[in-house]
From Swiss-Prot:
One of its GO terms (biological process) is embryonic skeletal system development. SMART domains: HOX. This is Homeobox protein Dlx5a. GO terms for cellular component: nucleus. Gene3D superfamilies: Homeodomain-like. PROSITE patterns: HOMEOBOX_1, HOMEOBOX_2. Residues 15-47, 198-237 are annotated as: Disordered.
Protein backbone atom coordinates (compact mmCIF):
# COMPACT_ATOMS: atom_id res chain seq x y z
CA UNK A 1 0.00 0.00 0.00
CA UNK A 2 2.90 2.37 0.63
CA UNK A 3 4.07 1.87 -2.92
CA UNK A 4 0.74 2.97 -4.28
CA UNK A 5 0.74 6.18 -2.27
CA UNK A 6 4.32 6.95 -3.34
CA UNK A 7 3.39 6.72 -6.95
CA UNK A 8 0.32 8.89 -6.52
CA UNK A 9 1.97 11.80 -4.73
CA UNK A 10 4.20 12.95 -7.63
CA UNK A 11 1.23 12.94 -10.00
CA UNK A 12 -0.31 15.93 -8.19
CA UNK A 13 0.57 19.10 -10.11
CA UNK A 14 -0.38 22.73 -9.60
CA UNK A 15 -2.32 22.58 -12.83
CA UNK A 16 -4.70 20.11 -11.19
CA UNK A 17 -6.05 22.86 -8.96
CA UNK A 18 -7.29 24.99 -11.80
CA UNK A 19 -10.84 26.26 -11.95
CA UNK A 20 -13.04 23.27 -12.80
CA UNK A 21 -15.47 25.44 -14.75
CA UNK A 22 -12.88 26.64 -17.27
CA UNK A 23 -12.84 23.45 -19.30
CA UNK A 24 -16.17 23.04 -21.04
CA UNK A 25 -15.35 19.58 -22.33
CA UNK A 26 -14.55 18.10 -18.96
CA UNK A 27 -17.12 16.15 -17.05
CA UNK A 28 -17.30 14.45 -13.73
CA UNK A 29 -15.87 10.92 -13.70
CA UNK A 30 -18.69 9.72 -11.48
CA UNK A 31 -21.03 10.11 -14.46
CA UNK A 32 -19.02 7.63 -16.47
CA UNK A 33 -19.04 4.77 -13.98
CA UNK A 34 -22.07 4.13 -11.77
CA UNK A 35 -20.02 1.77 -9.62
CA UNK A 36 -17.28 4.22 -8.54
CA UNK A 37 -17.63 6.89 -5.83
CA UNK A 38 -17.15 10.52 -6.60
CA UNK A 39 -13.48 11.24 -7.12
CA UNK A 40 -11.68 14.29 -5.81
CA UNK A 41 -9.14 16.46 -7.50
CA UNK A 42 -6.30 14.19 -6.32
CA UNK A 43 -7.90 11.14 -7.95
CA UNK A 44 -8.43 12.71 -11.36
CA UNK A 45 -4.96 11.92 -12.57
CA UNK A 46 -4.91 8.54 -10.91
CA UNK A 47 -7.98 7.25 -12.76
CA UNK A 48 -7.44 9.10 -16.05
CA UNK A 49 -7.46 6.87 -19.15
CA UNK A 50 -4.39 8.44 -20.78
CA UNK A 51 -2.69 9.73 -17.69
CA UNK A 52 -2.39 13.28 -19.03
CA UNK A 53 -6.03 14.34 -19.23
CA UNK A 54 -7.37 15.73 -16.02
CA UNK A 55 -11.05 15.55 -15.23
CA UNK A 56 -12.84 18.31 -13.41
CA UNK A 57 -16.37 18.93 -12.37
CA UNK A 58 -19.04 19.08 -15.00
CA UNK A 59 -19.79 22.56 -16.22
CA UNK A 60 -23.44 23.54 -16.63
CA UNK A 61 -22.59 25.03 -20.03
CA UNK A 62 -20.72 21.98 -21.20
CA UNK A 63 -21.73 20.40 -24.48
CA UNK A 64 -21.54 16.93 -23.00
CA UNK A 65 -23.84 17.76 -20.08
CA UNK A 66 -26.86 15.44 -20.03
CA UNK A 67 -25.62 13.22 -22.92
CA UNK A 68 -25.42 9.46 -22.50
CA UNK A 69 -21.90 8.28 -21.78
CA UNK A 70 -20.28 5.30 -23.41
CA UNK A 71 -18.50 2.58 -21.53
CA UNK A 72 -14.86 3.37 -20.91
CA UNK A 73 -11.82 1.65 -19.55
CA UNK A 74 -9.92 3.03 -16.61
CA UNK A 75 -6.60 2.00 -15.12
CA UNK A 76 -6.06 0.43 -11.80
CA UNK A 77 -2.79 -0.26 -10.05
CA UNK A 78 -2.13 -3.30 -8.00
CA UNK A 79 0.08 -3.62 -4.97
CA UNK A 80 3.13 -4.54 -7.02
CA UNK A 81 2.73 -1.49 -9.22
CA UNK A 82 1.37 -3.29 -12.27
CA UNK A 83 -1.49 -1.63 -14.06
CA UNK A 84 -4.27 -3.01 -16.18
CA UNK A 85 -7.53 -2.11 -17.86
CA UNK A 86 -10.91 -2.89 -16.37
CA UNK A 87 -13.71 -3.18 -18.88
CA UNK A 88 -17.08 -1.76 -17.96
CA UNK A 89 -18.77 -4.67 -19.78
CA UNK A 90 -17.37 -7.25 -17.40
CA UNK A 91 -20.38 -6.87 -15.07
CA UNK A 92 -23.95 -7.70 -16.11
CA UNK A 93 -26.21 -4.97 -17.34
CA UNK A 94 -28.49 -3.46 -14.69
CA UNK A 95 -31.31 -3.13 -17.20
CA UNK A 96 -31.65 -6.90 -17.47
CA UNK A 97 -32.31 -7.14 -13.73
CA UNK A 98 -34.85 -4.35 -13.94
CA UNK A 99 -36.66 -6.02 -16.83
CA UNK A 100 -36.73 -9.38 -15.08
CA UNK A 101 -38.00 -7.75 -11.90
CA UNK A 102 -40.86 -5.99 -13.71
CA UNK A 103 -41.80 -9.18 -15.52
CA UNK A 104 -41.89 -11.11 -12.24
CA UNK A 105 -43.83 -8.34 -10.52
CA UNK A 106 -46.39 -8.28 -13.33
CA UNK A 107 -46.85 -12.04 -13.15
CA UNK A 108 -47.22 -11.88 -9.37
CA UNK A 109 -49.84 -9.13 -9.60
CA UNK A 110 -51.84 -11.09 -12.18
CA UNK A 111 -51.78 -14.17 -9.96
CA UNK A 112 -52.90 -12.16 -6.93
CA UNK A 113 -55.64 -10.38 -8.88
CA UNK A 114 -57.32 -13.69 -9.74
CA UNK A 115 -59.53 -14.68 -6.76
CA UNK A 116 -59.29 -18.16 -5.40
CA UNK A 117 -62.24 -20.55 -5.98
CA UNK A 118 -63.19 -20.31 -2.31
CA UNK A 119 -63.44 -16.52 -2.46
CA UNK A 120 -65.42 -16.71 -5.70
CA UNK A 121 -67.89 -19.14 -4.14
CA UNK A 122 -68.33 -16.81 -1.20
CA UNK A 123 -69.10 -13.81 -3.42
CA UNK A 124 -71.44 -15.64 -5.82
CA UNK A 125 -74.47 -15.97 -3.47
CA UNK A 126 -74.85 -12.18 -3.51
CA UNK A 127 -76.28 -12.38 -7.06
CA UNK A 128 -78.77 -15.05 -8.07
CA UNK A 129 -80.04 -15.84 -11.55
CA UNK A 130 -83.85 -15.74 -11.73
CA UNK A 131 -85.40 -16.43 -15.15
CA UNK A 132 -82.07 -15.71 -16.79
CA UNK A 133 -81.73 -12.33 -15.08
CA UNK A 134 -79.40 -11.52 -12.21
CA UNK A 135 -81.18 -10.73 -8.98
CA UNK A 136 -79.48 -9.44 -5.89
CA UNK A 137 -80.08 -11.48 -2.78
CA UNK A 138 -81.59 -9.43 0.00
CA UNK A 139 -80.05 -9.47 3.43
CA UNK A 140 -81.93 -11.35 6.15
CA UNK A 141 -84.51 -9.30 7.99
CA UNK A 142 -83.84 -8.15 11.51
CA UNK A 143 -85.79 -10.08 14.14
CA UNK A 144 -86.80 -7.80 16.99
CA UNK A 145 -87.59 -9.09 20.45
CA UNK A 146 -90.83 -8.34 22.28
CA UNK A 147 -89.09 -5.85 24.54
CA UNK A 148 -87.56 -4.01 21.59
CA UNK A 149 -90.86 -3.86 19.70
CA UNK A 150 -92.72 -2.54 22.75
CA UNK A 151 -90.12 0.19 23.32
CA UNK A 152 -90.10 1.18 19.65
CA UNK A 153 -93.91 1.31 19.57
CA UNK A 154 -94.07 3.52 22.66
CA UNK A 155 -91.53 5.92 21.19
CA UNK A 156 -93.38 5.97 17.86
CA UNK A 157 -96.60 6.94 19.61
CA UNK A 158 -94.81 9.91 21.14
CA UNK A 159 -93.06 11.04 17.98
CA UNK A 160 -92.83 9.65 14.47
CA UNK A 161 -89.47 11.27 13.69
CA UNK A 162 -86.33 10.95 15.76
CA UNK A 163 -83.39 13.31 15.83
CA UNK A 164 -79.91 11.90 15.52
CA UNK A 165 -79.11 12.06 19.28
CA UNK A 166 -82.48 10.51 20.16
CA UNK A 167 -82.01 7.73 17.64
CA UNK A 168 -78.51 7.00 18.94
CA UNK A 169 -79.75 6.90 22.53
CA UNK A 170 -82.69 4.63 21.69
CA UNK A 171 -80.50 2.26 19.67
CA UNK A 172 -77.95 2.03 22.49
CA UNK A 173 -80.63 1.34 25.10
CA UNK A 174 -82.22 -1.44 23.01
CA UNK A 175 -79.00 -3.01 21.78
CA UNK A 176 -79.71 -2.15 18.14
CA UNK A 177 -77.88 -0.17 15.51
CA UNK A 178 -79.00 3.27 14.41
CA UNK A 179 -79.72 1.91 10.94
CA UNK A 180 -82.10 -0.71 12.34
CA UNK A 181 -83.98 1.91 14.36
CA UNK A 182 -84.19 4.23 11.35
CA UNK A 183 -85.52 1.48 9.08
CA UNK A 184 -88.11 0.42 11.66
CA UNK A 185 -89.44 3.98 11.93
CA UNK A 186 -89.52 4.33 8.14
CA UNK A 187 -91.51 1.12 7.74
CA UNK A 188 -93.86 2.15 10.53
CA UNK A 189 -94.56 5.51 8.92
CA UNK A 190 -95.19 3.83 5.56
CA UNK A 191 -97.71 1.43 7.10
CA UNK A 192 -99.45 4.30 8.87
CA UNK A 193 -99.76 6.32 5.66
CA UNK A 194 -101.13 3.29 3.83
CA UNK A 195 -103.77 2.75 6.52
CA UNK A 196 -104.80 6.40 6.41
CA UNK A 197 -104.97 6.32 2.60
CA UNK A 198 -107.24 3.26 2.50
CA UNK A 199 -109.67 4.92 4.90
CA UNK A 200 -109.35 2.31 7.60
CA UNK A 201 -109.49 2.87 11.33
CA UNK A 202 -107.74 5.95 12.67
CA UNK A 203 -104.25 5.39 14.02
CA UNK A 204 -105.31 5.84 17.63
CA UNK A 205 -107.95 3.10 17.33
CA UNK A 206 -106.10 0.66 15.09
CA UNK A 207 -104.07 -1.88 17.09
CA UNK A 208 -100.54 -2.25 15.91
CA UNK A 209 -99.57 -5.59 14.49
CA UNK A 210 -95.98 -5.14 15.61
CA UNK A 211 -96.91 -4.29 19.22
CA UNK A 212 -96.91 -7.51 21.26
CA UNK A 213 -98.74 -5.76 24.12
CA UNK A 214 -101.75 -4.87 21.97
CA UNK A 215 -104.71 -7.23 22.08
CA UNK A 216 -105.62 -8.12 18.51
CA UNK A 217 -108.14 -10.86 19.35
CA UNK A 218 -111.84 -10.09 18.80
CA UNK A 219 -113.83 -9.06 21.80
CA UNK A 220 -115.76 -11.81 23.52
CA UNK A 221 -119.54 -11.34 23.69
CA UNK A 222 -121.19 -10.37 26.93
CA UNK A 223 -122.33 -13.05 29.33
CA UNK A 224 -125.98 -12.17 28.99
CA UNK A 225 -125.78 -12.31 25.19
CA UNK A 226 -124.80 -15.96 25.17
CA UNK A 227 -128.07 -17.03 26.80
CA UNK A 228 -130.04 -16.39 23.65
CA UNK A 229 -133.34 -14.54 23.31
CA UNK A 230 -135.52 -14.20 26.35
CA UNK A 231 -138.40 -16.68 26.59
CA UNK A 232 -141.94 -15.60 27.41
CA UNK A 233 -143.08 -16.18 30.99
CA UNK A 234 -145.20 -19.28 30.39
CA UNK A 235 -143.67 -21.47 33.04
CA UNK A 236 -146.61 -23.94 33.58
CA UNK A 237 -146.93 -24.64 29.89
CA UNK A 238 -143.19 -25.14 29.54
CA UNK A 239 -143.16 -27.63 32.43
CA UNK A 240 -145.98 -29.66 30.90
CA UNK A 241 -144.26 -29.71 27.54
CA UNK A 242 -141.06 -30.94 29.12
CA UNK A 243 -142.88 -33.72 30.98
CA UNK A 244 -144.64 -34.95 27.87
CA UNK A 245 -141.39 -34.89 25.94
CA UNK A 246 -139.71 -36.97 28.62
CA UNK A 247 -142.47 -39.57 28.49
CA UNK A 248 -142.25 -39.81 24.73
CA UNK A 249 -138.52 -40.29 24.88
CA UNK A 250 -138.96 -42.95 27.55
CA UNK A 251 -141.36 -44.88 25.34
CA UNK A 252 -138.97 -44.71 22.43
CA UNK A 253 -136.14 -45.84 24.66
CA UNK A 254 -137.87 -49.10 25.53
CA UNK A 255 -136.67 -51.97 23.38
CA UNK A 256 -138.69 -55.09 22.92
CA UNK A 257 -136.82 -58.30 22.43
CA UNK A 258 -138.56 -61.59 21.95
CA UNK A 259 -137.22 -65.07 22.41
CA UNK A 260 -139.64 -67.89 22.05
CA UNK A 261 -142.68 -67.07 24.17
CA UNK A 262 -140.95 -64.48 26.38
CA UNK A 263 -140.38 -60.78 25.92
CA UNK A 264 -137.40 -58.99 27.34
CA UNK A 265 -137.98 -55.35 28.00
CA UNK A 266 -135.17 -52.83 28.41
CA UNK A 267 -136.44 -49.79 30.17
CA UNK A 268 -134.79 -46.52 30.89
CA UNK A 269 -132.79 -46.23 33.20
CA UNK A 270 -131.29 -49.47 31.84
CA UNK A 271 -132.98 -52.07 34.02
CA UNK A 272 -133.36 -55.40 32.24
CA UNK A 273 -136.06 -57.79 33.41
CA UNK A 274 -138.40 -60.36 31.88
CA UNK A 275 -142.12 -60.35 31.98
CA UNK A 276 -144.32 -63.36 31.70
CA UNK A 277 -146.78 -63.35 28.89
CA UNK A 278 -150.26 -62.99 30.36
CA UNK A 279 -153.56 -63.27 28.76
CA UNK A 280 -153.23 -60.50 26.19
CA UNK A 281 -151.67 -58.06 28.68
CA UNK A 282 -148.20 -56.62 28.29
CA UNK A 283 -146.54 -54.96 31.22
Amino acid sequence: MTGVFDRRIPSIKPADFQNPFQLSTMHHPSQESPTLPESTATDSGYYSPAGGVHHGYCSPNSGTYGKPLNAYQYQYHGVNGSSGNYSAKSYPDYGSYSTAYHQYAGTYNRVQSQPSPQEKETAEPEVRMVNGKPKKVRKPRTIYSSFQLAALQRRFQNTQYLALPERAELAASLGLTQTQVKIWFQNKRSKLKKIMKNGELPPEHSPSSSDPMACNSPQSPAVWDSQGPQRPHHQPQNINTAASTFLEMRELFVVFLYRGDEFFTLQAPGTLHSLALGSGTLY
